[in-house]
A protein has these predicted regions:
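Structured soluble/peripheral alpha/beta segments that form catalytic or ligand/cofactor-binding pockets
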Residues: 10-13, 25-29, 34, 42, ...
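Intrinsic-disorder/low-complexity recognition with aromatic hotspots
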Residues: 20-23
Length: 266
């Protein structure tokens, strides 16, 4: 329990880190298409765009064996690596510290803090994400009563990268990780929906304007994940993507005309 962990404690910690389980999950997702050139531009190599420029905006809440209860929101984009189709985590927001730290340190998810809520009343489902008083995106859907079959297995891609201690460049090449999810869906409802994306200096979601809404999905499920490092990208090549996943530090000068909080909400 102290600052120096025993071998027994380390084993328990690593077992939890290596085998995350998320139970009683509830999630609203809106699938939509963007321009192919837009999707290709935001994908870091070695990820490749898929034939369908699919983006998924989602809001949900979860219980877990490793980071407690939390709610969150995310933007995933379709991508492929060596022929394995998955979803690249472009942006992801959590309402608690533990899932943020876990996602960043272990998996490489670009997690930031935000307020996220999911609402369901009958066939109507909605979700929203807000950060520092500014809306990030909102989802609204009406379920048709049609039930689908959720994927028993799915994949997400992330990059682990570290800013150099000097402030210039990265400490080493970025690592591409792949998480394999084993899903057990109890509810997988299909419907129609809409998504509203709000851009800002730190969260440029306006780059993902939908050209076609595919469908809305409301799901309830349990899932477990295993993550592995599958590739690397040269630090200089990944640097623009690395900083694109963060807030813009150059806009957070206390001596500027706006305070840091005002910069985040402008």
């Amino acid at each position: 329990m102290g600052y120096i962990k025993s071998q027994e404690e380390i084993a328990q910690i690593e077992n939890a880190l290596a085998r995350p389980v998320y139970r009683n999950s509830q999630r609203l997702a809106i699938e939509f298409l963007i321009e192919k050139k837009s999707l290709a531009r935001i994908l870091p190599p070695p990820l490749q765009p898929t034939d369908t420029p699919l983006v998924v905006a989602s809001v949900g809440r979860w219980q877990s064996n490793v980071v407690g209860d939390f709610s969150g929101a995310a933007i995933h984009v379709a991508a492929s690596h060596h022929g394995v189709l998955g979803m690249y985590v472009l942006a992801i927001y959590m309402n608690r510290e533990h899932p943020i730290i876990y996602g960043r340190d272990v998996v490489g998810e670009p997690k930031k803090w935000a307020h996220a809520e999911l609402f369901k009343g009958g066939s109507l489902v909605s979700g929203l994400a807000e950060r520092n008083g500014r809306p990030l995106f909102s989802l609204n859907a009406e379920m048709s009563g049609e039930s689908g079959i959720g994927p028993a297995q799915s994949f997400t891609y992330n990059f682990k990268s570290r800013t150099s201690a000097s402030g210039y460049g990265l400490e080493e090449d970025a690592i591409l990780t792949k998480t394999t999810w084993k899903n057990d869906f109890r509810v997988f409802e299909i419907g129609e929906g809409e998504v509203k994306l709000v851009g800002g200096p730190h969260d440029p979601l306006e780059e993902l304007q939908p050209i076609e809404i595919i469908r809305a999905i409301y799901s309830e499920y349990d899932t477990s994940g295993t993550c592995e490092a599958v590739d690397k990208i040269e630090s200089k090549t990944f640097l623009p993507f690395h900083y694109g996943r963060m807030d813009s530090w150059n806009l957070l000068d206390s001596n500027s005309h706006m305070s840091p909080h005002e910069e985040l909400t402008s």
